[in-house]
A protein has these predicted regions:
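Short glycine/proline- and aromatic-enriched beta-strand/turn motifs that initiate or cap beta-hairpins
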Residues: 20-63, 160
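Extracellular loop and loop/strand-boundary signature of outer-membrane beta-barrel proteins
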Residues: 25, 53, 96-99, 138-142
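Short glycine-rich beta-strand segments
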Residues: 31-35, 85-93, 110, 129-135, ...
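Gram-negative (and chloroplast) outer-membrane scaffold detector with strong preference
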Residues: 42-126
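Flexible, surface-exposed loop regions and adjacent strand-edge segments
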Residues: 102-104, 141-147
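Outer-membrane beta-barrel "beta-signal"
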Residues: 146-161
Length: 161
């Protein structure tokens, strides 16, 4: 009996985590949330993607980064996937906050939902990006802190499917 339950559990697990081919290969667009940011996303295979982004954070400071994500289909909604992954980012506040010259580097996780429209070349997503600042250079000499306030709403034009 335990073997049958285990086999049913494994079959359910494998069916719910199976991946289908990605809905697109490459897209470009913008993110809003932790700044006004340009985003380029490309899939390396059916489930793994790189999101390279850069732009303007609050008060005109510069920011950028790269996220590596693994995508999983949500079987009940065509075109909807969830994703998780990790990455790195930087923020440069030099000169925009008056006397403060601030540079920050962080490592981050990411988790989100992504929807790709079937009939138009558009993809939208929302994500949460908790970040641990591993280097910070400013007048206050703070190091290693948690930033739980990063995330974004993204819209991208699909360049090729």
């Amino acid at each position: 009996m335990k073997t049958k339950i285990f086999n049913l559990f494994m079959a359910f697990f494998l069916l719910t985590t199976m991946s289908q081919a990605q809905d697109y290969k490459t897209s470009i667009g913008g993110k809003v949330g932790y700044g006004l940011v340009a985003s380029y996303k490309t899939f390396m295979n059916d489930t793994k993607a790189l999101d390279i982004y850069g732009g303007i954070h609050w008060a005109g400071s510069l920011m950028g980064g790269v996220n590596y994500s693994i995508h999983k289909d949500i079987q009940s909604v065509d075109g909807l996937r969830w994703y998780y992954g990790f990455g790195g980012n930087f923020f440069n506040y030099g000169g925009v906050l008056g006397a403060v010259n601030w540079f920050e580097v962080g490592v981050s996780g990411n988790i989100g939902l992504e929807y790709t429209f079937k009939d138009i070349p558009l993809n939208i997503s929302v994500d949460y990006v908790p970040t641990i600042v591993i280097y910070e250079n400013d007048d206050f000499n703070r190091f290693s802190r948690f930033r739980g306030d990063y995330g974004a709403l993204t819209a991208r034009y699909i360049l090729n499917r």
